[in-house]
Curated annotation (Swiss-Prot):
GO BP annotations listed: rRNA base methylation
Protein name listed in UniProt: Ribosomal RNA small subunit methyltransferase H
Binding-site list for S-adenosyl-L-methionine: 37-39, 57, 83, 105, 112
Keyword Cytoplasm attributed: yes
Keywords, in A-Z order: Cytoplasm, Methyltransferase, rRNA processing, S-adenosyl-L-methionine, Transferase
GO molecular function, one term: rRNA (cytosine-N4-)-methyltransferase activity
Entry superkingdom: Bacteria
Biological source species: Pseudomonas putida (strain ATCC 47054 / DSM 6125 / CFBP 8728 / NCIMB 11950 / KT2440)
Length: 315
């Protein structure tokens, strides 16, 4: 597979995210969402000869890019796995509790959105796929073809936050009984007609497509598992930086960090004898949530929804 697909990706919050990791020259770091390697390359430029960086991605095109980088720089290794599985990879490499920092840059990348053949976009017609790894799992077309109307509506509503989810799901099922969906443009058109109240400046298929993508790739489940695995992998004093792009992701990150700042006692039954340390925070927050600067927004409008939260492990 060619590495240069012709679709460019501008890394969001590049300097801010790498700075948030408080890099040590000899540290071991994880880039849980390698993508096209923007963050990884900057991290490597700041590491010394003893530093190490382990990258994760599900996307075969990202893996090809990562393999090329690994061939150039022996401090870097790329792994084709979801960051939700980083715990197993870290354990296999003897790095549990020894990682100095973890970076997660969530969501879909610009090359994935802009390449019609990946099936993520309602703007460019392509096969209705949406899988980060096209070799694994059920495609969006397969899900739409077989799921009950109630399940399609749930995905649109729960993951896409689409208020007309039921109406749009019924329109999808009515159309699939006549002709199956195989192309993104066909689905987008049906969703467009079924949506009675278009949001200004937003394509009426936007929320439903987001819901489908999140469901097909189990993005929220992976995020919850990945956050826990990242915290376990970190050494005391290690940093976790997470960039999210919509409210569902950010809510999970915010609640995860808030719970650990408070300590674990809130999650235990009342009157249960516990050791004092469970009342102590497991992490501390580093600064407030960060957003793209005006300069970055101007250069890359897609950064407008990005929010980064950073935490440091205390115990």
């Amino acid at each position: 597979m060619t590495i240069d697909s012709g679709f460019n990706h501008i890394t969001v919050l590049l300097d801010e995210a790498v700075e948030a990791l408080a890099l040590r020259a000899d540290g071991c770091y994880l880039d849980g969402t390698f993508g096209r390697g923007g963050h990884s390359r900057l991290i490597l430029s700041k590491l010394g000869p003893q530093g190490r960086l382990l990258g994760f991605d599900k996307d075969p095109q990202a893996i090809a890019t990562g393999q090329a980088l690994a061939a150039e720089d022996g401090r870097f290794v790329i792994v084709q796995r979801s960051f939700a599985e980083l715990g197993a990879e870290v354990a296999a490499r003897g790095l549990h509790g020894k990682v100095s920092g973890v970076l997660l840059d969530l969501g879909v990348s610009s090359p994935q959105l802009d390449d019609p053949e990946r099936g993520f976009s309602f703007l460019n017609d392509g096969p209705l796929d949406m899988r980060m790894n096209p070799d694994q799992g059920v495609s969006a077309a397969e899900f739409i073809a077989t799921a009950p109307v109630e399940e399609i509506a749930r995905v649109f509503k729960e993951y896409g936050e689409e208020r007309f989810a039921g109406r749009m799901a019924r329109a999808v099922v009515e159309r699939r009984e006549k002709q199956p969906f195989t192309r993104t443009a066909d689905l987008a058109e049906v969703l467009k007609v079924a949506n009675p109240a278009w949001e200004k400046g937003k394509n009426p298929a936007t929320r439903a497509f987001q819901g489908l993508r999140i469901h097909v790739n189990n993005e929220l489940g992976d995020l919850e598992a990945g956050l826990e695995a990242a915290l376990d992998a970190l050494e005391v004093g290690g940093r976790l930086a997470v960039i999210s792009f919509h409210s569902l992701e950010d809510r999970i990150v915010k609640l995860f960090m808030r719970k650990l700042v408070k300590g674990e006692a809130d999650n235990l039954p009342r009157n249960l004898p516990v050791q004092h340390k469970v009342f102590e925070p497991k992490i501390k927050l580093i600064g407030k949530a960060q957003f793209a600067s005006e300069a970055e927004l101007k250069a890359n409008p897609r950064s407008r929804s990005a929010v980064m939260r950073v935490a440091e492990k205390l115990r």
